A protein has these predicted regions:
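A glycine- and Lys/Arg-enriched "phosphate-lid" helix/loop adjacent to the NTP-binding pocket
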Residues: 42-117, 124-126
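Secondary-structure boundary motif
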Residues: 18-22, 94, 122
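Conserved nucleotide-sensing/catalytic segment adjacent to the nucleotide-binding pocket
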Residues: 1-45
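Charged/polar, solvent-exposed surface patches and flexible loops
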Residues: 7-10, 14, 18, 90, ...
Length: 126
């Protein structure tokens, strides 16, 4: 578990709130809902899930690991990180959070960009 998850999730929520309605897209590798995974405190889980629910038109992507694991700056071994992947997916499924699995490759990243652009075009047409 990361230390002080309440602070980490709160800081992320603040960053998103500052740009909400001012930009077309906000990209993060640390969505607020992920904070609910990294805590055992129910009030933090509830706050993260509630805050996440405020943001509409979300696109969520689960990046499948494809490159060599780099342990620098990590709190987990590769096997532990893979276990977390499984548990995070289970949490997202349990919460009914829609996400798309994408290969962690340049082609996968390009696909995400295209998908975001398609969704942006749909929003502007409506």
């Amino acid at each position: 578990m990361l230390n002080c998850q309440f602070y980490i999730s709160g800081k992320q929520a603040f960053r998103l709130a500052r740009v909400y309605g001012k930009v077309d897209v906000a990209v993060t590798d640390s969505p607020i809902i992920l904070g609910s995974f990294y805590t055992d405190e129910e009030y933090i889980k509830t706050a993260c899930i509630g805050e996440d629910g405020k943001y509409k038109n979300q696109l969520n992507y689960f990046i499948e690991r494809r490159k060599a694991y780099n342990p620098a700056g990590r709190n987990q071994t590769e096997d532990e990180a893979k276990e977390i992947d499984v548990k995070v997916r289970a949490m997202l499924d349990k919460l009914g959070k829609h996400y798309v699995s994408v290969e962690g490759t340049l082609e996968g990243y390009d696909w995400i960009v295209e998908d975001v652009l398609i969704h942006l075009n749909k929003l502007t047409l409506n």
